[in-house]
From Swiss-Prot:
Gene name tied to this protein: ZNF793
Descriptive protein name: Zinc finger protein 793
Subcellular location: Nucleus
Organism: Homo sapiens (Human)
Chief place of localization: nucleus
GO cellular component, one term: nucleus
SMART domains from the UniProt entry: KRAB, ZnF_C2H2
Length: 406
């Protein structure tokens, strides 16, 4: 088998700044440069680099200024080099992926690409950037998409004239690590709600374009609610929430259960309903192990173990473990009776009380005794009746014991 190995020296990947350039960098830019260079050298050592440790690395490890020469990027002078480096990289990848070719056990070093910084010089950057960029034609400081490489070569002259406009933020490119970092850290956070995202932007100076996930989170601050319901006047921050709310007025239920055909207005409600058919109970009680189909049911159940009563009546101070119990209790203070019988007009504070009352009109008796078959309107009446049978059975057993002893 043929093993393809690409020799790389530190000279091929070094990045340099003159003394004047270094002083013009901000502390954050210097720290970014230091991190990139130290990681680059670490990558070279991990793939077999055996040369002596360069002076620039020694300086950076001591947090000193790395003045290593006048040229900012030896061997790189124009945008055409970006195209050349990327072509070489793709050729190497194609060679390694060709059938019959064995890949060396040593990981190939990350290549470096070139980019103009705010001072008109060229600096090197880890090619994690190229994982999302197939050609430099689609990537340039001004954010303009170019269809052909010749357009890019001509465009870089105009770009050089607009350095201040292109780099209004005056920041270096950020080193990219797509997805989660090895320690599980979420790299970017929203300043409004502190929610973190796993996708990093490629360019720090184009936050609204390159960091799409973070931008979508920031584009509507939580204080703004531009989507207003014409039916009830309720306002929402995001259009998706507004659309879901409108279904409460229109009665639309686009999510149907494939097992029983029941439809729901929200997908999350359908998922909860489907657990009835599948028998899945993913939420277990931490104390007794009892499982529930919904997380809220587990939370309510666990309060029976902890004794927590978070819902307090503002009128009398009585507390409850569930919010529904508090809502029922409040109606005692307000005198509200929203449930009205359509037969006799009698009103009730709870729907369950109305259902019980409704059976007096319909004659329905759903609770039957297993001993004698007698039926009742309400379950408490059945419980009282069953105690009669229990006492009779106990008395009969006592008589049998007495007769047996004699």
């Amino acid at each position: 088998m043929i093993e393809y190995q690409i020799p790389v020296s530190f000279k091929d990947v070094v990045v340099g700044f003159t003394q004047e350039e270094w002083h013009r960098l901000s502390p954050a830019q210097r720290a970014l440069y230091r991190d990139v260079m130290l990681e680059t050298y670490s990558n070279l050592v991990s793939v077999g680099y055996e040369g002596t440790k360069p002076d620039v690395i020694l300086r950076l490890e001591q947090e000193e200024a790395p003045w290593i020469g006048e040229a900012a990027c030896p061997g790189c002078h124009c945008w055409e080099d970006i195209w050349r480096v990327n072509i070489q990289r793709k050729r190497r990848q194609d060679m390694l992926l060709r059938p019959g070719a064995a890949i060396s056990k040593k990981t190939l070093p990350k290549e470096k690409s070139c980019e103009y910084n705010k001072f008109g010089k060229i600096s090197l950057l880890s090619t994690d950037l190229f994982s999302s960029i197939q050609s430099p034609s689609n990537w340039n400081p001004c954010g303009k998409n170019l269809n052909h490489n010749l357009d890019l070569i001509g465009f870089k002259r105009n770009c050089a004239k607009k350095q201040d406009e292109c780099y209004a933020y005056g920041k270096l490119l950020q080193r990219i690590n797509h997805g989660r970092r090895p320690n599980g850290e979420k790299p970017r956070g929203c300043s409004h709600c502190e929610k973190a995202f796993t996708q990093n932007p490629a360019l720090m100076y184009k936050p609204a374009v390159s960091d799409s996930l973070l931008y979508k989170r920031k584009r509507v601050p939580p204080t703004e609610k531009p989507h207003v319901c014409s039916e009830c006047g309720k306002a929402f921050c995001y259009k998706s929430e507004f659309i879901r709310h409108q279904r409460s007025h229109t009665g639309e239920k686009p999510y149907g259960c494939t097992d029983c055909g029941k439809a729901f207005s929200h997908k999350s409600t359908l998922i909860k309903h489907q657990r009835i058919h599948t028998g899945v109970r993913p939420f277990e009680c931490f104390f007794c192990g009892k499982a529930f189909t919904q997380k809220s049911h587990r939370t309510e159940h666990q309060r029976t173990h902890t004794g927590e009563r978070p819902f307090v009546c503002s009128e009398c101070g009585k507390s409850f473990g569930e919010k529904s119990y508090l809502n029922v209790h409040r109606k005692m203070h307000t005198g509200e009776r929203p449930y009205r019988c359509r037969e006799c007009g009698k009103s009730f504070s709870q729907k369950s009380c109305l259902n019980k009352h409704w059976r007096t009109h319909t004659g329905e008796k759903p609770y039957g005794c297993n001993e004698c078959g007698k039926a009742f309107y309400q379950k408490p009446n059945l419980s009282r009746h069953q105690k009669i049978h229990a006492r009779k059975n106990a008395y009969r057993n006592e008589n049998l014991i007495i007769v047996g002893n004699t």
